Amino acid sequence: MPFQQHEQTGLVWFTADVLNDVPHGFSTRKGGVSPAPWDSLNLRPGQGDGPEKLLENYRRFFAVLGLDETRAVLSQQTHTANIRTVTAEDAGKGLLRPRDYTDVDALITNVPGLPLTVFSADCGTVLLYDPVHQAIGAVHAGWRGCAAGIVEKTVAAMGAAYGSRPADLLAALGPCIGPCCFETDGDVPEAMRAALGAITNAYITVKGPKFHVDLAGLNRQWLLRAGLLPERIEVSGICTACRPDLFWSHRKMGDQRGVQVAVISLKEGL
């Protein structure tokens, strides 16, 4: 199995075998302290559960990953294809310090000990690791970001900033809404076809007047188009909307919910 489920002190999370050499994880809703409707491991700032519970949830999740939550760098997602190059000065932004950036759906860095953190409650998340140049990326890739090519653009940004070669990169695509549940109107397939071309049709099923879209499959196609090798890409295959016991799903729950995170960090002291 390319993805592993872990449980410790009530926390449940997933990791990808392809990223075993770096601290990383995909959270679930299990193991935190937030009350309903954010029960219980909500990691979304600014919700009704309050900052104290949010910080405790981060402390718990980052502890099982061996990471320091006080150095986490959080995205500021608005379904864009914008990428931020993270430096040591960004440590703690979004959690302990205000973010001085907006409209950022992907983060990259080569600084050890800076956990890059992106959010999801159905959207795709992609974690990237360059073992040659010791660089990482974290991407929020919902359908708008997917259609805008954020995954391919993040790979290119890592190349420009750190010399990362696509063939060296390792990638893990976390739990997201699956084609079983991601039912859309025609605008989503049209946007995907405009971006990716005919290959899109393999990831879209027509059901009457509606379309079912394989978001993870399309994000994987962007990775392949960017030059990643198929054997260096792992996909969770887990649908967030099918598992309300484990995940929050915007499609199933609306706005009154928490969010999961995908986080990756470079080891310190190497």
Predicted features by range, described:
Residues 1-270:
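Active-site microenvironment for binding and transforming phosphate-containing groups
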